[in-house]
C-alpha cells in the first residue's frame, strides 16, 4: 500500500508552519526580505518565473521540498522517464516525454525502441504535411487543399485547437484549420459553414476509431463531403486521413491506411498534442516549426529531469499549488494569459490537470486522505479584469493565479493617441494586477486620499492574494511547448505527493456507458420502461414529449 503522506513528519511540520504563517501578509514578507523579488525566481528554458508573490517564506520552501522527498519524488520522476509502468491501474508506461526526444536519443521500453517509433511517425507526418502544404496532395476533383478540419474530442481536440490558435502567426502555407468536437450537431454545422468540399481535408483523430462523438461527426462529415462533391465513396480517401491505431476500422470507413498515423498506449490523450494528434498543427505551421514545438517541450523535460529540486520550476510550482490546496483550503487556480492567442489555454489545462488529478483514491485503491485536484479556469487579460477579477481582489475565496506574459507581441498597434504601443498598455495592466493582488491598498491609504468615510471599506484592497508570474520573450512554437511541459510536470509532482495515478481516467467511463444505454430509451417508438430513479425517469419522459415521442 502507498504510504499516507499526511502521516509524514514533513506534513505535520507544514501544518504547524501554516498555523504560523497564514496570517502573515505579503507586505510583511517583502519588508522582511526586500530581495525576495529577485531571489524567489527560477528559469526553465525561455521561461522566467517569479514566485515571490506567494504566501511562503524560505522555511515553507524547505518544508515543501522535504515533503516531496518524503514522497520519493525524484525516484518517481526517474521511473517515469525510464519508461517504468507508473500508470499502475492500466499497467502502462507514461512516456509523453519520449514524443519530444531527439532522433539520436535512445529509450528502449518493453523491448521496443520508442524513439525510433516516434520519429518514424514524425517523418511520415512531415512527408504528408509537406504534400498538403505544397499543393501536391489534391482532392478528388484535382483541387489543392485550403482547409483542414480536425475531428476529435478531449485530448484529440483541446490540444490541437489551443496550439493552432496560439501559433496562428506561423500558419504560412495558406491553410486554415477548423475543429469539430462536440456531438451537438451545431458544432459541425458551424464548422463546415462556408467550406468547399473540394478543398477540404478531414483528420479523424481517435486511437480506437470507435469514439462515439468522433465517429458520429466523421460520418456526418463524410456525408457532407460526398453530397457536396456528387461523388461516390472512392472520394473519401482523398479527403480523409486518420490518427488511429485500428487499421481495420479506418479502412472500413474508406480511409487509405497509408494515411493513418498512429500513437501508443503509453501516451494519454491529454498528453498527446505533440504526437500524431498534432497533425493538424503540423499542416498549418510546417514540420520545421513543429520540430521547434517539440524542442520546447524537451527543454523543460530536461530541466525537470536534471535540475535540483530547489531550482526546479515544475517542482516548486507544483508544491506551491499543493500548499494552497491542502493547507489553505484553496479549491481553484486562475490561469490568466495576457495574450489573446492563448484564449484556449485555460480550457486545455482543465483537461490536463483535472482529468489527471481529480482522483479520490490512491494508486493502491485506498481513499485519499486529503483534497486533490485543483480546479483550473481563466480567461485572457484584459478581458478577465472586466469580468471576474473583482472576486480575485475583494472576494472571500482564496484563488491563487498564474499570470503569463510576453516581452514581444505577436501583433502590435499604436495606442489611441498614436504615441505608444498597445502591447505596452497590455503589459502595464499585467504588472499592475499582480502588484495589486499582492499588496492591495489599506483603509488608511484610501482615507488619506480624501475618500468619503462611508466608501472607505468598499474601496479597501486587502491584497495578500498570491500569484505566479511567468514571462517569455515571445509566444513561439518552442515557448508554447515549454509552457505545456511546465504544467504537465506540475501535475506529476502533485500526483506523486498525493499518491494517486495521474495517468488514468476511470471517472469518465460510466457516463459513456449510461449514454449508450439511454439513447434507445430516448428514441424508441414505444413507451419506455421506468428508469431506475424517478428523476431520470421524469426527465426522459419530458424529453420524449418534446420530440413527439410520448
From Swiss-Prot:
Pathway note: Carbohydrate biosynthesis; gluconeogenesis; Carbohydrate degradation; glycolysis; D-glyceraldehyde 3-phosphate and glycerone phosphate from D-glucose: step 2/4
Presence of the UniProt keyword Cytoplasm in the record: yes
InterPro entries, alphabetized: G6P_Isomerase, G6P_Isomerase_C, Phosphoglucose_isomerase_CS, SIS_dom_sf, SIS_PGI_1, SIS_PGI_2
Catalytic activity: alpha-D-glucose 6-phosphate = beta-D-fructose 6-phosphate
Major localization class: cytoplasm
Pfam family, any one: PGI
Cellular component, GO annotation: cytosol
Enzymatic class: isomerase
UniProt xrefs under PANTHER family: GLUCOSE-6-PHOSPHATE ISOMERASE
Full protein name: Glucose-6-phosphate isomerase 1
Taxonomic path: Bacteria, Bacillati, Actinomycetota, Actinomycetes, Mycobacteriales
